């Protein structure tokens, strides 16, 4: 290669030096081109190929990086667009907020047969169905005191109904949103209360579990009223207490206010993890964190709740309640902030409606880890209930 190239270059130099007609700009360009070709030929094919391959690899890497950045930008714009669109969607469709508050479509635990409470370890419990209104059917569980569990084996609904007239007090339990009357933490609470000598009657509101109907605040309250009246017809003079948890505290205060207005109050009201009203709870809920400082938060997220007829105004209801009130709240509650429970107590305590009744607030330290739904684990709970409600007397056997 080198021998063939050198004469061409020498001949071109001689022509240029002798002043041939090709001299000038064109000749200079030709000369530069010849020199470049000579250098490439002298260098040989070896070193040039790796440099070209490296350049091609770098171009491919840059292309992939640009493609990744483009895809990330698309994802970012999609998420940002969704973030902005959700408030408008909720404002235009208030029913979405109602579903998020009730969460009745979340049925946990899954695949349990609510007709068989014994599968949940409640072998002294009877399942039945009541009909508060036309086209509405609600599933009910009645757990008798633990001391009766042997006698309860194989008994029918009539036996359980008759048992309500025994000397054991009765707790009507109103659960919170999501899940069913067979939720794990709820079942554990039934067991604790049953072991303390209480009848426990609980049910799924319309639209929850195997209950039929469409959820609403009015409907949930009416379901609770129907079950309370059903109990009172069968309980004689036995004390009947109402226990509400989380969203169930809103149902409980609605119910008790109505009972007090008709002058048939329960013997006591227990509120576990209560809030003041649904607007304040929605604003404090962990789901609202990413939108809490969004411009127009109240207009986008809270006003649709009110327009759907959902208020659960515990702070207003307690001003019209005339029975003993016990509030239980864990300091580490991540769902209903502890401050809302304390605020509700501060509203209720000075109310004139409670001047002849005791109002008590029991906090549970955050170190205990009871959070939103595990107060039933407290070893102090039996003592708290005995002191507040009075020690249960042993009843006659059925």
From Swiss-Prot:
E.C. code: 3.1.-.-, 3.1.1.23
GO molecular function: lysophospholipase activity; monoacylglycerol lipase activity; phospholipase activity
Region (Disordered): 1-24
Active-site residues from the entry: 246 (nucleophile), 333 (charge relay system), 372 (charge relay system)
Catalytic activity from the UniProt record: 1-(9Z-octadecenoyl)-sn-glycero-3-phospho-L-serine + H2O = sn-glycero-3-phospho-L-serine + (9Z)-octadecenoate + H(+); 1-(9Z-octadecenoyl)-sn-glycero-3-phospho-(1'-sn-glycerol) + H2O = sn-glycero-3-phospho-(1'-sn-glycerol) + (9Z)-octadecenoate + H(+); 1-(9Z-octadecenoyl)-sn-glycero-3-phospho-(1D-myo-inositol) + H2O = sn-glycero-3-phospho-1D-myo-inositol + (9Z)-octadecenoate + H(+); 1-(9Z-octadecenoyl)-sn-glycero-3-phosphoethanolamine + H2O = sn-glycero-3-phosphoethanolamine + (9Z)-octadecenoate + H(+)
UniProt keyword terms in alphabetical order: Endoplasmic reticulum, Glycoprotein, Hydrolase, Lipid metabolism, Membrane, Transmembrane, Transmembrane helix
SUPFAM superfamilies attached to this UniProt entry: alpha/beta-Hydrolases
InterPro entries referenced in this protein's UniProt entry, alphabetically: AB_hydrolase_1 (IPR000073), AB_hydrolase_fold (IPR029058)
Pfam families xref list: Abhydrolase_1 (PF00561)
Membrane topology: Single-pass membrane protein
Positions of transmembrane segments: 75-95
Extracellular side of membrane: 96-398
Subcellular location: Endoplasmic reticulum membrane
Record function comment: Lysophosphatidylserine (LPS) lipase that mediates the hydrolysis of lysophosphatidylserine, a class of signaling lipids that regulates immunological and neurological processes. Represents a major lysophosphatidylserine lipase in the brain, thereby playing a key role in the central nervous system. Also able to hydrolyze oxidized phosphatidylserine; oxidized phosphatidylserine is produced in response to severe inflammatory stress and constitutes a proapoptotic 'eat me' signal.
Name listed for the protein in its UniProt record: Lysophosphatidylserine lipase ABHD12
Source organism: Bos taurus
